[in-house]
Amino acid sequence: MYLTLIILPLLGSIVSGFFGRKVGVKGAHLITCVSVITTTFLAILAFFEVGFNNIPVTINVARWVDVESLYVLWNFRFDSLTVSMFITVLIVSSLVHIYSISYMSHDPHNQRFFSYLSLFTFMMIILVTGNNYLIMFVGWEGVGVCSYLLVNFWFTRIAANQSSLSALLTNREGDTLLTVGMFAILWSFGNIDYSTVFALAPYYNENIITIIGICLLIGATAKSSQVGLHIWLPQAMEGPTPVSALIHAATMVTAGVYLLMRSSPLIEYSSTVLVLCLWLGAITTVFSSLIGLFQQDIKKVIAYSTMSQLGMMVIAVGLSSYNLALFHLVNHAFYKALLFLGAGSVIHAVADNQDFRKYGGLREFLPLTYSVMLIASLSLVAVPFMTGFYSKDFILESAYGQYYLSSTIVYFVATIGAMFTTLYSAKVLYLTFLTNPNGPLVNYKHAHEGDLFMTIPLIILAIFSIFFGYLTKDIFIGLGTGFFTDNSLFIHPSHEIMLDTEFAVPTFFKLLPFVFTVSLSLLSVLLSEFLPKLLINFKFSRLGYNIFSFFNQRFYIELFYNKYIVEGVLKLGGQTSKNLNKGPVKLLGPYGLEKGGLALSNSLGNLSTGIVTTYALYILIGLIFDISLLYFSYNDNNLLILIIFTLFALLNSNKK
């Protein structure tokens, strides 16, 4: 069953990609969807068998690397962390496959699209099941390549080309440091197998663990779009909307957080890495929330919302609450996929326009889409008893419950981020569905809900967004849960804060995020409805214009990168190519070898004079040289060099 679970998406991808012309569009739909849905049911069985029974399964497939002391097996491990990620990845992936049947129905390259989707799913499965860092890295690079292929699916669009390259190159920065971290693990521990590394981690110097942890954190920063290496995420919205739902909800962006959770037995022994995670997540949460508030593209707003929630997960990792980070990751996948697919339904209905300032009044035309996006938004802002409430608010409470200065500051910073998350969620809903119509009349004439293939995934995800958090909270974060007793997640006893979070945090600080978010949402709606002139006048004032430009242009970070980093790197590359590659390297390399070979062949050709006595002299010199070589190899080497030099001088004089 477990090998079938891994192989099925790959088989679907191969059939759809290589035999698409034979099976046709409907055949590609059927094969890829059946393979992924079957894999999903197998994953649910694995969740109950492995997770609830605490019976990790390891499958050894083949020997991969066997060089001196390095021995790497191609093997897969199924534990509670793996099967929890399966639930997220495969349920969302199967629903995205079904949704794409209708959404991509008019595209001429359906087989290629579904092949990429299934390949993406397969690579994510490899990433979460790998039993060592090397196999994990295969899946890590695989999802990066598939992301490039999917974002650049409409390859005739310049914006898609640029966005896919941005995603690929930005992730290479993190991948480079992750590779350095893997080499550091290999150098320190002598192996890259999870069980070996994690068993030895307590006995190693904290400085070594810190260096390795920072390398892993930078790798996760790129993949999970944290501040500094985040610029690829909003640009990746150029791909089809189902791709956005798959990449930014359940697969690629969660890979970085998964890496940190999987490495919990390692980074738990470095307080520096945990503090870095804490602050990185807090800064990312506020940073992305502020930018998202000033965007006008509906998909980019949701993308920055994803970035904000990933920051929350990294905060949970910094608090050593890995089970809480996993719980939020799983919850977030469902309501974020619902937001993206709901946005896709809106875009599909209004002739592919993504600027929500040109929507308005769509509640009457898209009642189902409005309902599911309302549910997803309520879950995103952690309204009580929705799925997001059980994990997001618990992360904020845990930050306060650690009772350190840094975690208390992070609590207030993350609360501010949650407030702005509520604001832009209300903004999207209000301007898309509730305000007066602002778009062209022709869009409203043709606006309609999608067919069954588009509506069924929305309804299923809406159910998950309401009930999943309540039904599974005791499994993931309950005080008596035994779900993680297989040691897939490790929390050092001195870092355990779950009891303090549950019972010691004052009620005021538990309610503060909810009160702030509701108050700010009501204030924003009141200002928009009853005092719109005040907002408009402020926006067109000099101060308002500067504030809007600063946040709308994403803190000018991309401008800074392009002007000072990219330009400098390109100049350095140009000078290196001009002065080094085309200079000494070329002289010593191809050009020098060519000229040297020609000169040598000409010199040897000049020795052929056609005179018998000259050839007799060559034979005599060769004989003397051989005898001298044997004799002087046991005596003075300097004399041997002198004789060789004399022979060459005689040859040259004879040639002249």
From Swiss-Prot:
It is found in: Mitochondrion inner membrane. It holds the Pfam family Proton_antipo_N. It comes from the Eukaryota. One of its GO terms (biological process) is electron transport coupled proton transport. It catalyses: a ubiquinone + NADH + 5 H(+)(in) = a ubiquinol + NAD(+) + 4 H(+)(out). The chain crosses the membrane at residues 4-21, 28-50, 81-103, 112-129, 133-155, 176-198, 208-230, 243-262, 272-294, 301-319, 329-351, 364-386, 409-431, 452-471, 514-536, 603-625, 629-651. GO terms for cellular component: mitochondrial inner membrane. It is a multi-pass membrane protein. Keywords: Electron transport, Membrane, Mitochondrion, Mitochondrion inner membrane, NAD, Respiratory chain, Translocase, Transmembrane, Transmembrane helix, Transport, Ubiquinone. Its EC number is 7.1.1.2. GO terms for molecular function: NADH dehydrogenase (ubiquinone) activity. Core subunit of the mitochondrial membrane respiratory chain NADH dehydrogenase (Complex I) that is believed to belong to the minimal assembly required for catalysis. Complex I functions in the transfer of electrons from NADH to the respiratory chain. The immediate electron acceptor for the enzyme is believed to be ubiquinone. Belongs to the complex I subunit 5 family. NCBIfam families: NDH_I_L, PRK06590.1. This is NADH-ubiquinone oxidoreductase chain 5.
